[in-house]
Amino acid sequence: MDIRKRISIVLVALLALVGVSAQAQTVSGTLIDGQHKQPLGYAVVQLLGSDSTYVSGTTSDDTGRFALAAPRDGRYILKVSFVGMRTICHDVVVAGGKDKEVGALTLQADEHVLREVTIAAQAPKVVLKNDTFQYNASAYRVAEGSTVEALVKVLPGAEIGDDGSIKINGKEVKKILVDGKEFMTGDTKTAMKNLPASIIDKVKAYDQQSDLARVTGIDDGEEQTVLDFGMKQGMNKGFFTNINLSMGNHGRYSERGMAAYFKNNFRMMGFLSANNVGDMMFGGGRRGGFGQTRQGLNNTKMAGINMNYDNGKTWQWDGSLRWNHNNGDLQAKVFSDNFLASQHAYTRRISQQYTRSNSWDGRFRLEWTPDSMWNVMFRPSLQLSKSDGLDVSTSATFSEDPYAQGDDPLGDDLLAAMQAQGTLVNRQRNTTVTYGDNTSAQASLQVNRKLSANGRNVTLRFQGNYNDADAKTFSTQDLQYYQLLDAMGQDSIYRAYRYNLMPTKSHGMGVEATYSEPIARRTYLQLAYQYNYALSKSDRSTYDFFSLGGGYFDGVEPAYRSWDSYLALLQQPLGSYFDQSLSRYSEYKTHTQNIQLMIRMNQEKWRFNAGVQLQPQYSIYQQDYLGVHVDTVRNSFDWSPTIDFRYKFSPQSNLRLFYRGSATQPTMSQLLDITDNTDPQNVSVGNPGLRPAFTHRIHMFYNGYRQRYTQSWMTFFHFASVHNAIGNSVTYDASSGACVVRPVNINGNWNLNAGVMFNTSIDTLGVWNVNTFTTVDLNRYASLLQQSRQSLVERNITNQTNLSERLTLSYRNSWLEVALDGSVEYNHTKNQLQSAQNLNTWRFAYGGSINLTAPWGTSLSTDLHMNSRRGYNDASLNSNELLWNAQVAQSFLRGKPLTISLQLYDILHQQSNLSRVVNAMGRTDTEYNSINSYALLTISYRFNLFGGKPQHPAGVRRGDDGPMMGPPGGRPPMGPPGGRPPMGPPGGRPPMGHPGGRPF
């Protein structure tokens, strides 16, 4: 089946969406919060017969609107109720087969009900409005003391990667907001792991417009996906704090504190945290899935402050400052199957890596709007960081699968056996000690002037950046070849002992002018010109100690910044070991111009943007390396067309189609005709004949929502194809296991990613809910492979197919939540040249969770899931892991501000951590050490002070840090305390200890 047929099948499947059926007669209206004069969402609305028998029911949407079906003409009673407010009944007459609009109905606060009401209806899990997905936090139970990361993990369509990256409905989240205000800009991870879930009422996911589009009012299509956490009503007044202190067995601990202060137009939030559970406590996995792969043991500390001010007229500013410290202990067991023509190449590597880092990050945004025609925005930022690293690894390369001989490929017995068989290619041991010190600063200034009220604008933007980095590296490499003999007929040995000093400096500046001209009703022509200048200098000094002989530094114990321990053994002054050939000086200057012409049409129902960007570039590159002096000038020209179309079927249903083409120029190092053999196992060769690559990207996104049963659905489709992709031609030497890599242009690379999400409540009160999320990933990688310099070049194609499905059925009321869930992930890898190595792997997960909450403040949560893997080379990885977590919590004092909880993670000691990566060159499976089974005893305390008086509300919601809500009369939280511990918990052994060295 060719690519076009595959794409057609996927498109047809994605676009076969559920139709929306219309009601013949409806009773509709709008609900208003009497105290706050705002729309009242998620209230229970029931239509009763004249004898008070139930006819139909629903809940109001985010705008307070509701609509119910009236089966026939007659008299009805409209009953509206909401927790904390007085229930109202309204007589309704439906006649003549016509819809009935009852207008605005106002509900008033009821203090008595607020204290004693039992919630009958449940807030809808997700509501769609325009292009915004709004998740109601009260509909998702998370464990006591959880941060918003645990909440996001259980949202439909959400994915959190191993590196902490967040995806919502297939799009990566770039920024976190709180109540629409910027929060810890530039670091989504800090916000996710420190913002308490207990203060959150709603989570919105949407595409935020660029600064330029927001101030000009003209959509430029340059959005970034954001998560906007809305705080509970009443929480944005006065002062509140949350403190969580946890101690556990095996030396585990996790401490976290948060305080917030609000006064008039000013808000300030501060955070402190320290833990050695890998930042993975309180929400390790997601329902029906495997969760994140935990990589190593990490001790982290963080302190941060975030401030916002908005006087509502002319001034706004946001500022954040954070400090992060990390100590890492990562052990990785790696097995690689390299796709090297008809020749097999397997590599087994075990590495132990220690890291530590300190970093400071400060950011600020100032916006001044003196009148309706002017807008000025200034964004400065500063980052400081220091880091240390220590890496010790042992590896071996084989021409046959070592697991066919035994379970320990790096064991002495198996290595000796494979050497005797002639299938052991090489064996090496590496030690690397690194240090880095980096300072960087950026600033941008944007000035916009509206020339008229109909969209005529002129904008000027200035930006600059500066970076100063200093790095040191000491490395030893001992490599023995078993199929490559030296002059004496013995196994050949290669050694490299080197010390590198690498200072790097760079700076840049840019200026941009944009002009928008209305040419018709809601139609604009936009012209932009940008000039950027960048300069980067690097001067690496390399000292080579090869002449000292093998094993010269064996007596040195590697440690952080242990340069003196190595250098003290030198027989001559350090300068006498300087190697001019291996040292490298480079200087790179670029002058880039961007010229953009766009037409933008912003109609009521649809928006259309189309345009082209032209990018001429002039570059000057100088380099001294490997005895070759380079001084070259290069001119290039790129272009990028864009088409963006959006159609709004209704406020809850939208379609977006997007296309962009973009060119990518090869780097200077790829173009230089230089052979770099400083690493004999990975030799790189330049290619002066490289042409630029051109990537075509097509995106489709559609969402819909139906108020009855609170049904929402979403589908997305992303496709990218690269013409003249810059790939690699690899020549493999079977006798040494070395690769010579040369960049080449190659066609045939593409990827497709698509998904469908559907969420619905089965009943009108939202007690029963079903969610399904299906994804398809197709990838095609092309490369060129050669057995030797004399053999023919073979074209290799690797196709990868990944299918996944997650399904969840849940029941919830005010004191109980039960969920059954499951997922399946299928991965098929097919290699053109090594069909015998094609693999089909499966990952299954299924189980359930139960959360019970007693009215006296006790909550009990447990979940049990079976995780299974099949199809891996290493039989030990084809396992069944039964993961059981449990938590019990008790809240105390008036308003339940004090909570004591016990969490048990991976009670059965079966959690493991494995990741797989497939690309054009091969397939790699990696198993990491991790924090597995442990227990934590946690004490949480919450203090609220609103309007100068401590608040201890009696209304409760869900199991976060205990009950929390705003002052009487506001919308109270919906749901009880309680929650579940993470499904895929951390676990593992205590830290192995970090090497010594000077402190920061």
Locate each region found by the language model.
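Structural motif
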Residues: 30-40
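Short, acidic, small-residue-rich periplasmic hinge/interaction motif at the N-terminus
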Residues: 32, 46-48, 81-85, 95, ...
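A short, solvent-exposed loop/turn motif at the edges and junctions
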Residues: 48-54, 75-90
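Short, acidic Ser/Thr/Gly-rich low-complexity loop/linker segments typical of extracellular
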Residues: 50-65
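Short, surface-exposed beta-strand/beta-hairpin micro-motifs centered on an aromatic residue
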Residues: 61-70, 165, 191
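Periplasmic plug
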Residues: 128, 165-213, 226-231, 266
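Short, polar/charged loop or turn motifs at beta-strand boundaries
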Residues: 132-154, 167-168, 178-183, 244-249, ...
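Primarily recognizes Gram-negative and organellar outer-membrane beta-barrels
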Residues: 186, 209-251, 265-1000
